[in-house]
Amino acid sequence: MPREKVRVLIVDDSASVRQILQTILNDDPDIEVMGTASDPFAAARRLQNEIPDVMILDIEMPRMDGMTFLRKIMAQRPIPVIICSSLTEEGSNVMFEAFEAGAVDIVPKPKIDTRQALLECSTRLREAVKSAARARVRPRAERRVVEKKLTADAIIPPPVQGKVRPTTERIVCIGASTGGTEALNDVLEMLPPHCPPLLIVQHMPAGFTAAFARRLDSVCQIRVKEAEDGEPVLPGSAYIAPGARHMLLQRIGLRYQIAIKDGPPVSRHRPSVDVLFRSAAQHAGANALGVIMTGMGDDGARGMLEMRKLGASTRAQDEDSCVVFGMPKEAIAHGGVEKVVPLHHIPREIMLWYQAGHVAVAG
């Protein structure tokens, strides 16, 4: 029996954008655009008759802006919503409001200036739609091109057993995707100032992560910033991988520092969780804790197994608290997960692991 297609409603005031999005999505045999709307009022009329699996929504529209419509939808009849908008530094705060209001993902409007740019945008959009269709949403208050899937070998060589130099410094590496922006907020705001350093890969487009880091920094006790190449890794700080670039952990003597590298997508993502986790296995070994959180796909599964093989502790977010139980599920299936915990237990797990290491060193 053929698999049912993901049915999508597109809401955007630009006729050309609606047409481009419709063409991109209908080219995928697993997706069907059930209709389009030029504004939220037209979309609301459409929703009275049929409910899509996923809605793609613009932010800036006449008569009613997308944010207001998103809040109404999530309060009255929640469905997975993807924000498709022009990403700018000035508009980043609006994007975070969208996540808080219940949007499951954000994608940039397709670029059609080059064939490669259009291909990358098309692939990202189709993957976002399929991921959103599997997302859990809760009520809130008011022909396909298959890319070669690269592994972390494209960026960093495999870790070698017995080659990790000793250090007493402990470090936490976290990977997340769909649903991760709010989940990371929940984790980081509960950590005390004396927590271990955290390196975080959250799948995000370029130009978005600096504002994300500033937003987290404003609500957390710890320092949160966008990671920079060559900067030292310090306790009480969290470092967010910049969008569209890989982040790696490195060692200078007994001290950790961050490396930011260009390169092809790994596990179809850049930044890639697999790349970060492999570098942690290579340079931190048993002094690392790997945490994999909500998200679609398998990025991080191989890297987490490499971490565990070299002595690291590992945790995965449980299915009930995930927006999409994809990345944790794959990491568990690969055998890389030591313990599965709900989202609200992750801060405690981090601190218990960190404090246990301090006791061991003191002893």
UniProtKB/Swiss-Prot annotation:
Q: Which GO terms describe its cellular component?
A: cytoplasm
As stated in the Swiss-Prot or TrEMBL entry, residues carrying the post-translational modification 4-aspartylphosphate are D58
GO MF term (any one): protein-glutamate methylesterase activity
Superkingdom classification of source:
Bacteria
**Alphabetically ordered keywords of this record:** Chemotaxis, Cytoplasm, Hydrolase, Phosphoprotein
Q: Which residues does the UniProt record annotate as the domain Response regulatory? A: 7-124
Write down the EC number. Answer: 3.1.1.61, 3.5.1.44
Pfam families for the chain: CheB_methylest, Response_reg
Present the record's domain note.
Contains a C-terminal catalytic domain, and an N-terminal region which modulates catalytic activity.
Q: What does this protein do?
A: Involved in chemotaxis. Part of a chemotaxis signal transduction system that modulates chemotaxis in response to various stimuli. Catalyzes the demethylation of specific methylglutamate residues introduced into the chemoreceptors (methyl-accepting chemotaxis proteins or MCP) by CheR. Also mediates the irreversible deamidation of specific glutamine residues to glutamic acid.
Q: Which family does it belong to?
A: Belongs to the CheB family.
Q: Return the protein name.
A: Protein-glutamate methylesterase/protein-glutamine glutaminase of group 3 operon
What species is this protein from? Bradyrhizobium diazoefficiens (strain JCM 10833 / BCRC 13528 / IAM 13628 / NBRC 14792 / USDA 110)
